[in-house]
Every structure is written in C-alpha cells, then in structure tokens.
C-alpha cells in the first residue's frame, strides 16, 4: 500500500551527478529513422531540432522535455501508456511519439515509435490513438492506472475543453475514488489549454472546474510554465511513493 501524503525525496539521483545526459536520453535525442522511411517535412524538422537539443545547440522545448521524461522512466523500470484521440502526434503536433511512413501501402503499417527503441531491457511504451469517446477511454485508463500503480498511465484530451465528455468519470471516480473506496490512482490527465483562435471550445481546459473539485489532497492540478517543469512533473508522478491523479494543463 502506498503511504498517503508521503513526500520523501525521489529515490533516483542520477540527474544531480553529472551534466552529461544518460545514454537512453541521448539515444532518444539522436533519433534514427528506419531505412527507407519517408516522413513529412514538418516531422523531419522536429526530429532535426531534437537532435540539436540533444547536442545542446537548442533549448529543450515542451515536446522534447515530455519525451525525455518518458525515455528516462522506461529505462528505469516504469512502463508508459499514453492514449487519446490524437496523442501519437499531439494536439499541437509537439509530441510526434509515433512517426509514419508516408509511402506505406496499408494504413496501419509503416509506423515507427522511437521510444520503443531506446535500449535492451527497457519497459514497454504504448501509444494509442483512441476512439472518439472521452468517457469510454478515460474510464478504461482510470481502471488501468488503479490496477497498475507502477506504470505511468496518461490520457490526453484532444483539446482540454473536450474532457467534459467524461465528466461523470472525473467526478465519480478520478476525484473521489480514494475517499469512497480507498482506490489509489496515479492517472495523468493531459489537457491542452490556452491556444486562442482554434474556434469555439478549443482554447480552455476550464481550470476553475478542476480547482472546485480539489478537496483533502484528492488530486493534483498543475499548470507548468517551463519545459523543465514538465519533465520533472511527469517523472515525479512515478518516482515518489505517492499515487494521486494528476491534471496537467499543457500548452
């Protein structure tokens, strides 16, 4: 049983020991596409930028920080499961955790997931572009996260506004399951938020609604302002001996 409200320091100390990135992080920064794979020009540009970030030539952006957090956890013994309607690419095309061969013959073939190829013996990274039902998918991921406390389980809304399609799951399970049934859950909800000009119901994750649901340390509501905060926020969700739902309003 995970101890409640235990905020002991993280047991992992490697990032304080050296300024050089560990091998798995460098491997992910130095992405190599499969031979003969044809990618979109935009994806190529993002990959080239990440290689430059790995060399210290560019500052880390949000997508790189998030992917590096996953890479570090995968090689430290924590499986990562990410699902959502557009999570392979990311709503604002920042993630690109799944790359597609533009010359593929069959639609479901020709995909390459760099986070599955970090090193021998790493844990599984699963990224699922899910069905268009927030309620069904979020409910499933909540159950998965409660049953697998040593896996980082994330659900991403296509836009933060759309999460209200699963409001019953949020109200009755995620924010109150521990108080009602003693069910600990480390589920992460990623809610893209704050982009104007995307049309009606495409710019606000409605932070105020989640703050109204906060009571007695039942959930964590975070609005990171730097890429570094995003990196450590995701790692902390697994490394500290505490399992609380995490709601992240992502840029």
What residue spans do the PLM features occupy?
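Flexible, glycine-rich loop/tail regions that form catalytic "lids" or insertion modules at the edges
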Residues: 1-251
């Amino acid at each position: 049983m995970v101890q409640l409200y235990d905020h002991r320091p993280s047991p992992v100390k490697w990032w304080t020991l050296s300024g050089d990135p560990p091998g798995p992080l460098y491997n992910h920064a130095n992405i190599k596409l499969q031979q003969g794979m044809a990618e979109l020009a935009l994806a190529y540009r993002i990959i080239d930028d990440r290689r430059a970030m790995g060399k210290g030539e560019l500052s880390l952006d949000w997508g790189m920080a998030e992917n590096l957090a996953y890479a570090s956890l995968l090689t430290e013994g924590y499986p990562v499961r990410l699902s959502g309607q557009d999570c392979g690419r990311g709503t604002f095309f920042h993630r690109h955790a799944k790359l597609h061969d533009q010359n593929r013959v069959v639609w479901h073939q020709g995909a390459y997931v760099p986070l599955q190829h970090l090193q021998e013996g790493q844990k599984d990274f699963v990224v699922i572009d899910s069905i268009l039902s927030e309620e069904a998918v979020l409910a499933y991921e909540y159950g998965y996260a409660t049953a697998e406390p040593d896996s980082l389980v994330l659900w991403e809304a296509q836009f933060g506004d759309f999460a209200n399609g699963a409001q019953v799951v949020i109200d009755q399970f995620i924010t109150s399951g521990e108080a009602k049934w003693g069910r600990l859950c480390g589920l992460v909800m990623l809610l893209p938020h704050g982009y104007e000009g995307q049309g009606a119901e495409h710019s606000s994750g409605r932070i105020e609604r989640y703050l109204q649901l906060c009571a007695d340390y039942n959930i964590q509501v975070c609005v990171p302002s730097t890429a570094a905060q995003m990196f450590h926020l995701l790692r902390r969700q697994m490394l500290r001996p505490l399992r609380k739902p995490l709601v992240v309003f992502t840029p």
